[in-house]
Amino acid sequence: MEIALEKTNDINIIALKGRLDVTTTANLDQTFAKLFESEGAKILVDCAELDYISSAGLRTLLAAAKNSKKQSGKIVLACLNQNVKQIFEISGFTQIFEIFDSRGSAAAAL
């Protein structure tokens, strides 16, 4: 999996590409840890090129959401493809995360 990190204004954008599973979650954990060094981090996770997410990937996102909330930050997700969106729906994660169809609408929610 590839992780691209960029910052636009005060929003940290994490773009995921490939598969997020048990073999790749450590890299995403490190990325989140770096961002959580700042209190109140605003994070947009762009999933446009995320092909698959496993339960390990879901746990990573859930842990990040909890850490973000503790630090008065916020995480939103954008551009989930149909397969990934279905995994979020089946697992109930659509109730946990704010999910948007575009980066622009996700950024506006931050």
Tell where the protein language model's regions lie, with residue ranges.
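Conserved catalytic submotifs in the C-terminal HATPase_c
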Residues: 8-10, 48, 104
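Acidic phosphotransfer microenvironment of two-component signaling modules
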Residues: 82, 104-105
